[in-house]
Design a protein with these regions (language model features):
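Acidic donor-binding loop of glycosyltransferase active sites
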Residues: 158, 278-284, 293-310, 324
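Short hydrophobic beta-strand element within catalytic cores of glycosyltransferases
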Residues: 320-321, 325-328
Length: 483
């Protein structure tokens, strides 16, 4: 019979609540050089929190996608393979046996393994330190499983962070999650110069003396770039010096699946409309410094997303911080950030309305400058130093309220158990029928003639319960009920 011994418990680790001692914080998410928005966010957040208090010691647990092999910096102390369930358990052990006092998780359904990224729950459940979770996506109509995952995150974490008021409202209406554990901290942006030499930056990009329209971000079909291209003929007929830059590489997942089909379609659309010479693709992944220069060179930033279901946009926040005049479709985050004449909105997919907005701004330098001034003044509150301070304040209050917690499930699940490969119950299932576990087998074939005995079924029940605690599955739960 298979026997799962109860290993020794991990030693208890005292948790200091003093903020005079080092505060090791583990940041979990994708990380540079991986090319995705959350990777950039994790880099910036870790640096901002470390800068906010001299005793903060950041470390990173980087989530790696199946196709990725990255040369991470020394900040990364542990690598979690996205689809390896065992890696999440090992990562929790690493944290529990380290000096980490708090974990900050960057949550997006698609970056973690399991159904809708459910493996992250295994990681959080096994931790013995407080956890704060930042939600990068909050859906209006989540699937039952997506809603359940966020509800479990809420139950298991000390604080759930969202980046906008609309995200907080959606948590309440679509997930049933509300209360003081939900905190709003905006998306951070770099500190940028108030009055850059815009013409010098334009000269660097070969467009000195021209009006620069800009969109940036990883390219994919949901970005709505075709709406802007279709608006160009009406605009360039009156302002022939205008050029539209589309800055950013094609999203890696899209590139693997479709290649450059979307970019090719956009180029053909521009050719057909006779505006190809007014369109320039900068199809590479840009550094933070290059991005700053592009944004500060731009006169108008266009965010033409096709769907309202966008509770946060780092690109939109960055553009406002650079002092660009922002024109956007009315997705949720844009409605919130651009209220109070901090930008201009136009309907989804409506290139005619967009052309009117662009003509108004290009034809009125006073209005254009007023929009830029309002955006820049508002964005000051989202600068990374302020966001780092806000996160540190939350970390400090969390540590004071809950310096240590007990891992859920089996008390302090040991390293030996969770480091095992995924448990296979095939033989035990084969040895079990509607009555219980059969007493003997010939090699792997159940010997039904030998019947059943109470002590074997009692031991089988113990094994099934322990298996369900260590690596829960429908099979282990079925065996518990059977025995």
């Amino acid at each position: 019979m298979l026997h799962l011994s109860q290993p020794d418990r991990a030693p208890t680790r005292a948790a200091s609540t003093s903020l005079d001692s080092p505060i090791a914080v583990a940041f979990v998410g994708t990380y540079a050089p991986r090319r995705c928005g959350i990777a950039t966010f994790t880099v910036d957040l870790a640096a901002a929190v470390a800068a906010s208090h001299r005793r903060v010691l950041p470390m990173v647990l980087a989530v790696t996608d199946p196709a990725g092999q990255y040369e991470y910096s020394s900040d990364v102390k542990f690598e979690i393979r996205q689809n390896s369930k065992a890696d999440y358990a090992r990562a929790a052990e690493f944290v529990n046996y380290s000096h980490v006092r708090l974990v900050s998780v960057q949550h997006e359904y698609g970056i973690f393994g399991g159904d809708d990224g459910g493996y992250i729950l295994d990681f959080i459940r096994a931790l013995r330190v407080p956890v704060v979770v930042t939600l990068h996506t909050v859906l209006k109509l989540p699937s039952p499983n997506q809603a359940a995952i966020v509800q479990k995150l809420f139950e298991q974490c000390a604080q759930l962070i969202v980046m906008s008021e609309v995200a907080r409202d959606l948590l309440a209406s679509s997930y049933g999650v509300r209360g003081p554990k939900v905190t709003i901290i905006p998306h951070g942006i770099p500190v940028m110069d108030r009055d850059p030499d815009q013409e010098a930056l334009k000269a660097k990009f070969g467009v000195r003396g021209r009006r620069l329209l800009l969109t940036f971000g990883l390219l994919s079909a949901n970005k709505g770039i075709e709406t802007v291209i279709r608006a160009l003929p009406a605009v360039v007929s009156q302002f022939p010096d205008l050029v539209y830059f589309v800055v950013g590489a094609t999203h890696p997942a899209v590139l693997r699946r479709e290649g450059e089909a979307y970019r090719t379609m956009l180029e053909r659309e521009a050719e057909k409309l006779g505006v190809r010479e007014h369109l320039a693709f900068r199809g590479q992944f840009v550094t933070s410094e290059e991005l700053r220069q592009y944004l500060q060179a731009a006169d108008i930033f266009v965010s033409p997303y096709l769907s309202e279901a966008q509770v946060t946009s780092g690109a939109l926040s960055y553009a406002m911080g650079a002092g660009a005049a922002v024109v956007s479709t009315p997705y949720w985050h844009a409605q919130e950030l651009l209220a109070g004449d901090r930008g201009r909105l136009f309907p989804f997919k409506d290139h005619v309305a967009l052309s009117r907005v662009l003509l108004d701004l290009c034809g009125s330098p006073v209005e254009l400058n007023a929009v830029r001034e309002a955006a820049f003044a508002f964005a000051h509150s989202m600068a990374w130093p302020r966001i780092g301070d806000a996160y540190f304040s939350l970390i400090r209050s969390t540590l004071r309220a809950a310096p240590q917690r007990q891992a859920a499930g089996v008390p302090r699940e040991p390293a030996a158990a969770s480091s095992l490969p995924e448990l296979t119950l095939n033989h035990l299932l084969r040895m079990t029928d509607d009555t219980g576990v059969i007493q003997h087998a010939v090699y792997s074939v159940p010997a039904r003639r030998t019947g059943y005995c109470v002590d074997d079924n009692a031991r089988a029940l113990i094994v099934a319960v322990q298996a369900d605690r260590v690596q829960a599955s429908p099979a282990s739960r079925a065996l518990v009920v059977r025995y």
